[in-house]
Design a protein with these regions (language model features):
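TPR/TPR-like alpha-solenoid helical repeat scaffolds
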Residues: 385, 415-430
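Short helix-capping/linker turns of helical repeat alpha-solenoids
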Residues: 3, 11, 16-19, 32-34, ...
Length: 452
């Protein structure tokens, strides 16, 4: 402490005589409380005196103070001005900072080409932050032409210096073969380096690699571990995935209550997948008290973000009045949104609406059209419904052979009602007139299945 006080006294004498370095050092003393009571206002005053004499270090620090409001009122324009003065004298950290100013329009008019100019100056001096940002500019085509090879070059330099963001992006380039030969093992290696430094995005991606065995030996427990690390940092995708792990006992002991807890965290951040999953939990009372109203509410949030399966579920809520007012027209509206994205379940239920005239004018031909779309995607209920139409001549001519073919496709997937329908047909003989009782039984099965 005594040495710091003596140094402070020496700096004071030299600073008052106009020595720029002493003025800067005096600013440091006041900023850190070295040998004197901490005083940010005094620090800024001395930095300014040194900066006005052209001392680059003081110019950069003064710019920082104007940026953060330490010892002076925030002033983005002055922050950028002093930062640029320091950058022009070759201070790498200042070059990186003024690059950021031009990149974002902080205190200056946004100019991404100038941002690239300054990032390059700093990057060539080895500034790791600038190397990463320059790589990102090349990757995104921001301020320069898109060039994955150049992006990889700068990502590599920053990654090898230990920058977690660069390590994550370098891994990403290896994963997708952008600017470098695709190599999932190397991608996993760089994701791990980034993840171990706490990068949530890399932690989430590394979890996916372990879940699916991409570039590493498949390990569900490791996947859950990395999902949890990312989830605890607030990554919504990881929170949803961790919820799924608890929901299905993947890599962790099955725990429906914990699944709901993580789904809720992600859902409240707007994650549409978690919103849908949470809706399922409330619909079936899995990990939470059954509540069809809350289920419908979460399905709606997900559906409004365009998630096709949630749109289908919301349509069913409207069609059957589950937790929401019964409204077949709204059901059809949501089914239509879902089928536009190719959802086989919604295609089948839209077919049901046309078959029964629920929310739309009854049209058996359109019913068959939607059943067929669903069936051709391999959806067992769509296959069953299409088979029923062929068996009974609803919207298509009676064709027992085709009916049997579609029933068999559904039955092969374990659809019990299809197996019963096959037995009814076979007991009467395929290709001949089916006994009235057998036909009636099949129609009855079809009607029951329409309700799901």
């Amino acid at each position: 402490a005594k040495d710091l006080e003596q140094a402070f006294e020496c700096y004071c004498k030299a600073a008052k005589q106009g020595n720029a370095r002493a003025q800067n050092n005096l600013g440091v003393c006041y900023m850190k409380g070295n040998g004197v009571t901490k005083d940010l206002v005094q620090a800024v005053e001395w930095y300014e005196r040194a900066a006005e004499q052209g001392l680059a270090a003081a110019q950069y620090t003064l710019g920082y103070c104007y940026k953060t409001g330490e010892g002076v009122e925030k002033d983005p324009k002055k922050a950028a001005m002093w930062c640029e003065k320091a950058a022009e004298q070759g201070i790498a950290v200042a070059q990186n900072s003024i690059g950021y100013c031009y990149d974002t329009g902080f205190g200056v008019e946004k100019d991404t080409s100038k941002a690239v100019f300054w990032y390059r100056k700093a990057a060539e001096q080895g500034n790791v932050g600038a190397q990463y940002k320059l790589g990102k500019c090349y990757y995104d085509g921001n301020g320069t032409e898109m060039n994955y090879s150049e992006a990889v070059k700068w990502y590599r330099k920053a990654a090898e210096q230990g920058d977690a963001n660069a390590q994550n992006m370098f891994g990403y380039c290896y994963e997708y073969g952008e600017g470098v030969a695709k190599d999932l093992a190397k991608a996993a290696e760089w994701y791990r380096k980034s993840a171990e430094q706490g990068n949530a995005t890399a932690q989430y991606t590394l979890a996916i690699f372990y879940k699916n065995g991409y570039g590493v030996t498949q390990n569900k427990a490791e996947a859950a571990k990395w999902y949890k690390k990312a989830a605890e940092q607030g990554d919504a995708n990881a929170q949803n995935s961790l919820g799924y792990c608890y929901d299905h006992g993947e890599g962790v002991e099955k725990n429906s209550a914990k699944a709901v807890e993580w789904y809720e965290r992600a859902a409240e951040q707007g994650n549409k997948f978690a919103q849908y999953n949470l809706g399922l939990c409330y619909e079936y009372g899995d990990g939470a008290t059954k509540d069809l109203g809350r289920a419908a509410e979460w399905y709606r949030k997900s559906a409004e973000q365009g998630y096709a399966v949630a749109q289908y579920k919301l349509g069913r809520c409207y069609q059957y009045g589950d937790g929401i007012e019964h409204d077949c027209q709204k059901a059809v509206e949501w089914y239509r949104k879902s089928v536009e994205q190719g959802c086989a379940m919604a295609q089948c239920d839209l077919g049901n609406c046309y078959r029964q005239g629920h929310g739309v004018e009854k049209n058996l031909e359109k019913a068959v059209e939607w059943y067929r779309k669903s069936a051709e995607q391999g959806y067992d209920r769509g296959q069953f419904c299409l088979a029923g139409c062929y068996e009974n001549g609803e919207g298509v001519p009676i064709d027992k052979e085709k009916a049997l073919q579609w029933y068999k496709k559904a039955a092969d997937q374990g659809f019990e009602s299809a197996e019963l329908a096959i037995n009814n047909m076979q007991s009467s003989g395929v290709g001949t007139a089916v006994a009235a009782g057998a036909a009636a039984a099949t129609v009855g099965l079809l009607w029951k299945i329409l309700r799901g």
